[in-house]
Structures are given as structure tokens and as C-alpha cells.
Design a protein with these regions (language model features):
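General N-terminal targeting signals
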Residues: 16-18, 48-50, 69-70, 137-139, ...
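Short basic/hydrophobic patches in alpha-helices and adjacent helix-turn junctions
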Residues: 106, 133-136, 158-159
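GST-like domain detector, emphasizing the conserved glutathione-binding G-site
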Residues: 1-119
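Extended, well-ordered alpha-helical scaffold segments
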Residues: 92-96, 147-159
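GST superfamily/GST-like fold recognition
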Residues: 117-142, 148-154
Length: 159
């Protein structure tokens, strides 16, 4: 494993992967990049247990749909942190972000992980980093209340 400086990517890395995206792996002389593609490949190629993805095509499709739904969370997150609008509009943006998180709170009502109770799976690993990033909103907008608080999102906060 090689850590790559994302601001100043080494020449060899950009030559290997012109998109410059991470994570990137070289497997069987082929370059693969993007988190989901890399994780899917590793899950299929290496015989590890437990698998990140379920065996059933239907369950895999549900994961892909949930990831597509999570794009709304990501969009609202970036809209909020990049905004220079007045507080009233920031509050509206924050509410949109919180509303986009609500379906994910509901998915966790009866289980510990999106994958179930036995441990995290692909969906858990793909969206977890975004929950860490939510704390950054307060750095950009100190007067805005915490985005993901335990009274509104007890399951997601625990997750």
C-alpha cells in the first residue's frame, strides 16, 4: 500500500491512473479506481469471510440503490459547506441535509449496521466516512447547530 498526497500527486501515479482518483489498485496489470469498484473487486477476487456484499442479486441491488440515495446526502453536504449565504438560508440547507439523512436513520432502527447485526458490509463502509465529515460543517459555519445530533439521529450517531 502506498499513500498518495492528494494535493500533489506523484507523476508515476497520474501516469498509471490519469483520473488521479483514489483508491487505486493495480491487479493483473489492470488499474482499478473508485471506492465502490475497488471494494467490489477485492470482495469478489479474494476469498475472505465475511464478504462485504451479500450473495443475493436482490440484496446487492438494494445496496446500490441505497448508495444512489446517499448521493443526495453528499450533494446537500457540499452545498452547505461551500455556501456563503446568510444564516437563514444556511439553516434551510442544513434541514435539507438532515432530511436526506432520515431514511438512513430509519434503516438502522432494528439493526446495528446497514448490513445487519453480524457486522458491517459494503454499504456501511461506503457511507461511514461521510458521517465523520459531518462534523466539518461546524468548522465552516460555527453559528450553525450540530448537523447530526443524538436526539434527532440516535442510531446514526451510534453507528
Amino acid at each position: 500500500m502506498i499513500n498518495v498526497n492528494l494535493i500533489s500527486k506523484p507523476k508515476w501515479f497520474v501516469e498509471m491512473n490519469p483520473s488521479g482518483k483514489v483508491p487505486t489498485i493495480l491487479y493483473n496489470n489492470q488499474v482499478y479506481y473508485e471506492s465502490l469498484a475497488v471494494c467490489d473487486l477485492l470482495d469478489e477476487v479474494f476469498d475472505t469471510s465475511p464478504k462485504l456484499n451479500p450473495e443475493s442479486a436482490e440484496e446487492k441491488a438494494k445496496i446500490k440503490m441505497a448508495l444512489a440515495d446517499f448521493d443526495t446526502v453528499i450533494r446537500h453536504y457540499y452545498t452547505l459547506i461551500r455556501s456563503t449565504k446568510p444564516m437563514e438560508e444556511l439553516q434551510e440547507m442544513k434541514e435539507k441535509l438532515e432530511n436526506s439523512l432520515k431514511p438512513f436513520e430509519l434503516k438502522l432502527l432494528e439493526k446495528l449496521y446497514f448490513n445487519g447485526n453480524s457486522g458491517p458490509g459494503m454499504l456501511d463502509y461506503m457511507i461511514w466516512p461521510w458521517f465523520e465529515r459531518l462534523a466539518i460543517v461546524e468548522m465552516f459555519h460555527p453559528d450553525l447547530c450540530q448537523v447530526m445530533n443524538s436526539s434527532m439521529f440516535p442510531k446514526l450517531v451510534t453507528f
